[in-house]
Amino acid sequence: MTVTNTYNPTLFFTRVVFQRITKFTAKANEENEILFYALFVADLCLDMKGGLIAINKPSGRTSAQCLNELKKIISNSELAQYFRPAPPHPNDRNRRRRKSNRLPDIKIGHGGTLDPLASGVLVVGLGTGTKQLSSLLSCMKTYRATALFGCSTDTYDSAGKIIKIAVHIPTKEEILSGLDAFRGDISQLPPLYSALHIQGKRLYEYAREGIPLPESIKARSMHCEELILKDFIPKEEHTYTDPDEFASKEAIESEELLRPIEGGAERHDLLAKTEQDINPQDGDEKINAKSPTTNSVTDVAKDQTVTNPKKRKFEVTDLARGSRPAIGPIAVLDMTVSSGFYVRSLIHDLGRQVNSEAHMVDLVRLKQGSFALDDENCFDFSEFSAPGWEEKLAAAFKIDLKGDETS
């Protein structure tokens, strides 16, 4: 995060003065031309600076909400001038379409979305640092996830509604054994409630509107470098509870259509090749695949090398009664995974792997690339609403707010 631009006190003072004038003074376009020429020249000498920082995103907020709030805070600070791009040249035709007395917004972006439920490392690029964010797309990430066994939900986490109650509660030994199927290179089916696109529309939009998917969801190749059971807590010793609401039959059927077969390693072998269909008497049509990597059950049946998948039993007896499910144990998992990995899917699939049901109740991103949650330079999001954050951020980018860059 070293800043290499040479600071010129005179030009810096000129730039700040003209910024204040253009912000608070409404003048004719002809008079503002002089101000824009001066501001343009000053910005050429005081180039935009920037870099990458890590913030600890709080649970309950989206990554976009955090970024918008951070943008507003920094834009109203002294540091904003360092993260704004140079204004357009006065002869630029597009400039005349903009408000003549408005400064450019600061440049800000993040290097990978975290679910609203999740907390932890969110890498933020400021100024020129936004150009470095693409380097984070392929880096490994480390998470600590908490799985609650006993039921599965439509969103695969605690924010969703129950779709199935477990008839078997796994032991610690069963979970340890079940983790073996998810290490190394695996195929992973993304959750229906995700931001992936199918034909220009996000998956969660189809789910919320109750619209059938126009094509099947493709299984994706992922890599799990490390997966360990950090802790196992029996149901009598933790305070987590299952969701209170049960999903509708339509939502359950949508989930049934996504999952090829129930449980076991057989599911992972067929994941990239099969699509499950509900029994014909249930009145649901099959989802036909349009990709070479995900075929319908009919296509798989033609392949003599693949065993015909079992039809999944569709049970809603407990859901129809509206009874509260039994609470199972929790398993705390530490994992280092490739980019694009869905931790929710791993937990959901782990539940099926041990002949049970599970959903995610907590997720913390511990590390992304070289940025770690326990680094002293990682900002807690609450710091930006307390005094002293400007000095800490300036120090991170080696900027002296008094006028000179630090070495």
UniProtKB/Swiss-Prot annotation:
Pfam hit, one: TruB_N
EC number: 5.4.99.25
Sites of Phosphothreonine modification: T293, T406
Family annotation (HAMAP family): TruB_bact
Primary site of residence: nucleus
Superkingdom as given in the UniProt entry: Eukaryota
Modified-residue entries (Phosphoserine), positions: S291, S296
Family affiliation: Belongs to the pseudouridine synthase TruB family.
Lineage: Eukaryota, Fungi, Dikarya, Ascomycota, Taphrinomycotina
Protein's name in the database: tRNA pseudouridine synthase 4
A GO BP entry: mRNA pseudouridine synthesis
Function: Responsible for synthesis of pseudouridine from uracil-55 in the psi GC loop of transfer RNAs. Also catalyzes pseudouridylation of mRNAs with the consensus sequence 5'-GGUUCRA-3'.
Gene3D superfamilies xref list: Pseudouridine synthase
GO molecular function: pseudouridine synthase activity; RNA binding; tRNA pseudouridine(55) synthase activity
Keywords annotated in UniProt: Isomerase, Mitochondrion, Nucleus, Phosphoprotein, tRNA processing
